[in-house]
Amino acid sequence: MRSLLQFLALSAAIALCVCYESHESSESAEDLFVPPQQANSFMTPQRGNAYSPPRGNGNNFNLMRTVKSPAERRAETCEDYSPCRFYAYRHGFQQAYQRYFGSGTHPQQRPAAAARRY
């Protein structure tokens, strides 16, 4: 029993010495999750698939990048802003984007029909 306790104490001391953090690398201090805007910054897109294999010398990275439609880009912008996202659940992304990001100024109110002079 006494030798078992000595072995456990020695094992704990060795574990503490081996697990000492040297501060040479701060990888353990990095965030586990990255923001959505940076999610694809370190991942390269697939070079091809069974339906469109890469041709030539493989320098077609820019040709195979998908170009997002303006509607998809607006929807992603709206998803990042929570009030716009909640409004979009009820009214759709197009209306939500127009409401929150549509124009820099508020639309001018038209004068009444009686006030118009032709």
Curated annotation (Swiss-Prot):
Expressed in heart, calcified cartilage (branchial arches), vertebra, gills and kidney. Within the gills, MGP is found mainly in the proliferating chondrocytes and the pericellular cartilage matrix in the incipient calcified cartilage of branchial arches and filaments. SUPFAM superfamilies: GLA-domain. Requires vitamin K-dependent gamma-carboxylation for its function. PROSITE patterns: GLA_2. GO terms for molecular function: calcium ion binding. It is found in: Secreted. Residues 56-102 form the Gla domain. GO terms for cellular component: collagen-containing extracellular matrix; extracellular region. Keywords: Chondrogenesis, Developmental protein, Differentiation, Disulfide bond, Gamma-carboxyglutamic acid, Osteogenesis, Phosphoprotein, Secreted, Signal. The modification Phosphoserine is found at residues 22, 25-26, 28. GO terms for biological process: cartilage development; cell differentiation; negative regulation of bone mineralization; ossification. Residues 1-19 form the signal peptide. It comes from the Eukaryota. The modification 4-carboxyglutamate is found at residues 21, 72, 76, 79. InterPro entries: GLA-like_dom_SF, GLA_domain, MGP. Disulfide bonds join 78-84. Belongs to the osteocalcin/matrix Gla protein family. Associates with the organic matrix of calcified cartilage. This is Matrix Gla protein. It comes from Argyrosomus regius (Meagre).
